[in-house]
Amino acid sequence: MRSDGLAFYIHPPKYKSHSWEQRKLGEVGTTYTGLSGKTKEDFGHGNGQFVTYMNVFSNPVGLPDMTEAVEIDDSQNKVLFGDVLFTTSSETPEEVGMSSVWLENAENTYLNSFCFGYRPTVEFNPYYLAYMLRSSSMRKKITFLAQGISRYNISKNKMMDIEIPIPKIEEQKQIGSYFRNLDNLITLHQRKYNKLQNVKKSMLEKMFPKNGSNIPEIRFA
């Protein structure tokens, strides 16, 4: 086992006899709409929050700090823990129908108007859902449904006809954990990379003489 926890086996013996079930999204969950009937005056204040389009578009797992304020409105659909959020339009077909799983328990959380929500009615590992829906095979299925010319849209009803692979819950957990660990490692190394870039930038300024000087600020002994 590698120290970073990323070692895995292809076709582990305990799962060899378990074929993955194929079910339509609409058979294992229900949908709901984002905010409706709002004007720009309704946003930017209030004790509620809504998940932004860019949060859904950019993150397999939604970020709690990428929300914006909105007034509480009990007539609107609320986003709950474990919901999957989908974008409904984009400038290119390859970017339509991007998904994000919401794993926060915050009250009075809503969804922006340019997305729709999906609530599973059977047990899923949320991290499995997050990464499976962004896999290359699923993205091809979703992209195929995109319609438009200058801007592309996707039908919620057609999305619900897409078949998804559903392994046993224990295998889902292992898959979800594996990709979650990968993302954590990527984030860690990205932070290290950013720090090293800052060090390099600083040293480029200090290890060469500035204009008007012939002595650098920092030099080797």
Where are these predicted regions, by residue range?
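Charged, alpha-helix-forming regions
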Residues: 2, 8-16, 204, 210-221
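Extended intrinsically disordered, low-complexity coil regions enriched in Ser, Thr, Gly, Ala
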Residues: 186-201, 209-214
